[in-house]
């Protein structure tokens, strides 16, 4: 994106343009201000334009009680990124997570179904971290201890058991918190997800989620101790909450094996809308932002219509939608009562289309 300054509608903002023009980058800038990182590229320096030495993203928000908030992120090549709230720099970026809750639905979500278990763990982490600081702290502690244990496992010289125990005890303590909170979350989340899926599919299929963890049947410390000899042969930790799995079912079978493109897409949209609903009712005093990037592709007309009915309702706050198809956007706008803005995106520049309702 080139330098862009935009004023958004408080309700609905639509962006249309051909692929590769910058629509997704625009949503990614909004995402960055919520999560301190890009949705698509975890390497910060790669988010700087090739012909530039830095990037800056600045967002001006209004909380539900009317309080203004300014969020700033800036980064120069070969320097640490700066993240500020109301001109005061964060010492820990994790303190910002959850302040501006956000849910994004994008084509990259297909990895939730087709990718490895790490994608599904990340889905749980992203939701729970936005409303539960204890969870985020436990997850950070667990991952640090896991990295230290893996370093010991790779050591070619014998390592004293006490050293292993230091990190295993930390993994067990933090891992039990992670397991308990993931289990509580999934139990509450399943009925919300199922109700969204049945609304979009008009009750055509049944769906489910099953959470599996090594922490379920035994103490995590015992699991780690028992696995240590095998782990040393492999050079990494084979068991623990970093191997948890969230099984995604269509009927009684894995959707990865059974689902059509339309069913997979419906599943992903329902997961993310349930994530939104869950965040809205759990702890946050701010309605999450909703980012919908090219979500109507591969869906039949009736499912598109059901999704449009959902997002046009009062349950959602500020929404950002991208599509290559102007007709899709016009169909949504017909159903919207109240404020919206439409923007055209071309070759990295963004222009508001006048004549549209503000």
Regions picked out by a protein language model, each given a short descriptive name:
Residues 34-113, 117-119, 125-131, 135, ...:
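Nucleotide-state sensing region of NTPase/ATPase domains
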Residues 23:
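Conserved lysine of the Walker
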Residues 90-169, 173, 283, 352-353:
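A conserved P-loop NTPase coupling/switch region
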Residues 1-18, 159-173, 177-289, 298, ...:
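Conserved NTPase motor "head" modules and their coupling/switch loops across ABC/AAA+ ATPases, GTPases
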Residues 59, 318-325:
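Structural recognition of the conserved hydrophobic beta-strand(s) that form the central parallel beta-sheet
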């Amino acid at each position: 994106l080139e330098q862009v300054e935009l004023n958004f509608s408080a309700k609905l903002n639509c962006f249309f343009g051909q692929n590769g023009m910058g629509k997704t980058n625009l949503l990614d800038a909004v995402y960055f201000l919520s999560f301190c990182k890009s949705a698509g590229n975890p390497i910060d320096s790669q988010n700087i334009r090739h012909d530039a030495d830095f990037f800056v993203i600045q967002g001006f928000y209004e909380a539900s009680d009317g309080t203004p908030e300014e969020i700033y992120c800036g980064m120069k090549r070969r320097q640490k990124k700066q993240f500020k709230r109301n001109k005061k720099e964060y010492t820990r970026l994790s303190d910002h997570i959850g302040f501006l809750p956000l849910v994004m639905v994008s084509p990259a979500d297909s990895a939730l179904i087709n990718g490895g278990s790490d994608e599904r763990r990340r889905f749980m982490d992203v939701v729970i971290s936005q409303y539960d600081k204890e969870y985020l702290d436990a997850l950070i502690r667990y991952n640090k201890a896991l990295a230290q244990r893996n370093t010991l496992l790779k050591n070619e010289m014998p390592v004293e058991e006490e050293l292993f125990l230091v990190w295993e005890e930390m993994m067990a303590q933090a891992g039990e918190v992670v397991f308990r909170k993931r289990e509580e979350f999934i139990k509450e989340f399943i009925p919300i997800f199922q109700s969204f899926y049945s609304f979009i599919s008009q009750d055509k299929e049944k769906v489910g989620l099953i959470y599996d963890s090594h922490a379920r049947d035994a103490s995590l410390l015992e699991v780690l101790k028992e696995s240590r000899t095998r782990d040393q042969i492999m050079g990494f930790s084979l068991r623990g909450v970093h191997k948890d799995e969230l099984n995604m079912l269509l009927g009684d079978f894995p959707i990865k094996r059974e689902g059509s493109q339309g069913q997979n897409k419906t599943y992903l949209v329902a997961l993310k809308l349930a994530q939104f609903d869950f965040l809205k009712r759990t702890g946050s005093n701010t309605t999450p932002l909703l980012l919908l990037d090219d979500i109507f592709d591969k869906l039949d007309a009736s499912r598109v219509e059901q999704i449009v009915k959902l997002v046009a309702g009062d349950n959602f706050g500020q929404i950002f939608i991208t599509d290559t198809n102007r007709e899709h956007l016009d169909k949504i706008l017909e159903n919207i009562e109240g404020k919206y803005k439409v923007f055209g995106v071309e070759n990295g520049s963004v222009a508001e289309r006048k004549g549209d309702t503000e």
